Amino acid sequence: MKIGILYICTGKYIVFWEDFYKSCQKYFLSNSDNVKKYYVFTDSDKIYGEVGNPNIHRFYQEALPWPDIALKRYEIFFQIKDILVEDTDYVFFFNGNSLFLDYIVWSEIAPDKQQGFLLSLSWNCYDGNQKFPYDRNIRSTAYIPYGKGDIYYQSGLTGGRTKEYIDLLQECREQTDIDYYNKVIAVYHDESHLNKFLLDRKIKVLSTNYGRPEKWKKPECAKMIFRDKYKIFGDEIYKMKGRRRKKLSASVFYRIAYLIKIKFHFK
């Protein structure tokens, strides 16, 4: 089976690539019958492992300011849709700070026909859908009214059969473009548009075992984590995301409060 892996590492985020690649090669669908092809979008002129490796494909991507690099994610990937159709059976996207810790086999994550051949990650740590951090701005194409939806998805891990995944990319790209034209930014950027696309769809839902923040203590047996950016970059992470540490906007304040809440939920 031909597995496509989408990955963005612009600017200083290139620091994550080598560890991600090594851990992915070792732990993710490492059966010899699977061929993993990496599609890496970066502004670096070289990346670890690419020399003499036909399965690493580097594409130039400028380091866009935050949150453009997140919002433009679907457009960036959609640009190589023809390559993905030709070269892959399934496609997965992983956040730049993803790191595999244990083996993940196909039977664990494979989405079937009843699941629309799509999958996404959900931390499942909310007290009912009224508390889901959906975009409640009616002007946004990502808008979801209160009372709707059964699951909130995290955008750090998504995937599926190539055809269905490209459909996801196309619709989310179109939603984002409409919002850009109307000068609207979805509350949690690409994640808000992902949740709108997946609203009321039956897909394969992956638990926190397949992607939790490094800071969380549970689950202890997580097979993949999202590395702590603050541990790598320190206070510079705030500059990289275009904000000052001591002067947070209301939306950022509530985002931090929300993360603190779910952190204690998993202790």
Which role does the model predict for each range below?
Residues 10-12, 45-47, 63-64, 98-100, ...:
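Short, solvent-exposed loop/turn segments at secondary-structure junctions
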Residues 36-43, 92, 117-118, 203-205:
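Short, hydrophobic beta-strand segments that form beta-sheet elements in well-ordered domains
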Residues 61-94, 102, 106, 189-198:
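A conserved donor-nucleotide-binding helix/loop in the catalytic core
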Residues 141-230:
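Catalytic core and acceptor-binding pocket of nucleotide-sugar-dependent glycosyltransferases
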Residues 15, 47-50, 100-103, 108-109, ...:
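Short catalytic/ligand-binding loop motif for oxyanion handling, primarily in non-cytosolic enzymes
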Residues 51-64, 74-76, 108-119, 221-225:
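Active-site regions of enzymes building and remodeling cell-envelope glycoconjugates
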Residues 1-69, 80-87, 232, 248, ...:
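N-terminal anchoring/stem segment of glycosyltransferases
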Residues 100-138:
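Conserved donor-nucleotide/metal-binding helix-loop-beta segment in metal-dependent transferases, i.e.
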